[in-house]
Amino acid sequence: MLDRLFNAGETEVALAKKLGIERTLIVPGNADFQDRVYEEMGEKLSSALNLLLPLGHSIVTILGGAALARSAKYLSPDLANNRQLEFVPGRGALGENVETQSNTIVQEMAAKTSGTYKTLYLPEQVSDDAYKSLIRESSIADVLQDISQSDAVIHGIGLAQEMAQRRGYNSIKLSELREKRAVTECFGCFFDEHGKVVDRITQVGLQFENLYKIPHIFAFACGARKAQAIKAYMPNAPHQTWLITDEGASNMILKGK
């Protein structure tokens, strides 16, 4: 039914089957060289949300990322028709690039869809003791409650070394990640090319183990340089995941590179 509604092409069907997920949406081009890809991915995301989100009050959890940050402004105001959308960040701020933080993206998405948003201003990476203390704070607990009741999650898929550097890994930790052959990072977990978790950070926000409870999940990643990272993460992705990507990444994955 969903394939018919979205006129799924052979490539999209083949990619979803290869990755073991519900659906893929592929836009033309390669984001490594063509900025227009982000506009089309934003429009695809908007159409998918319009199809899948329930009417009335809907909560959408957002995890930051460069691709999603560049596509957020292309959400359609039509999403607000018969909906009261609430956008919440899925994790604390990285503190490096404000534009790609989930706190910034939720504000832009809410503005585009006449929705509301909440923020989570705290370090993304914390100690175990600090985590136990923080989640008891009323303002933080309120956001975490919304996350647990989300109708949809939209997340990126990061390159392991890049994400580790943003999280302040020192040279020793970066070297250890290379030795463990970490390829990708998602939800604070670092995965090798086979999808095995080789490292993990304690973060406040959406926990990977709880992702399976969310009705609709959108993985948002593009460009040929992300192909290996996408492929490495997908063995862990819940089946209800939709991947929104471009030809640059999809062609590399299907060719087995």
Question: How should each PLM-predicted stretch be described?
Answer:
Residues M1-E10:
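N-terminal helix-turn-helix DNA-binding module of bacterial transcription factors
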Residues G9, E193-K257:
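ATP/nucleoside-binding phosphotransfer catalytic cores, i.e., glycine-rich phosphate-binding loops
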Residues T11-G56, A80-Q161, G168-N170, L174:
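Ligand-binding beta-strand-loop-alpha-helix segment within the catalytic cores
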Residues L51-L55, L79-N81, A110, L144-S148, ...:
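Solvent-exposed alpha-helices and their adjacent loops that cap or buttress functional pockets
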Residues S58, D151-A152, P215, T241:
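Conserved acidic residues
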Residues V60-S71, G95, L159-Q161, G223-K226:
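Gly/Ser/Thr-rich loops at beta-strand to alpha-helix junctions
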Residues S76-D78, Y169-S175, A232-H239:
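Short, solvent-exposed amphipathic alpha-helical segments in soluble enzyme
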Residues R166-K196:
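Gly/Ser/Thr-rich active-site loops/lids in small-molecule metabolic enzymes
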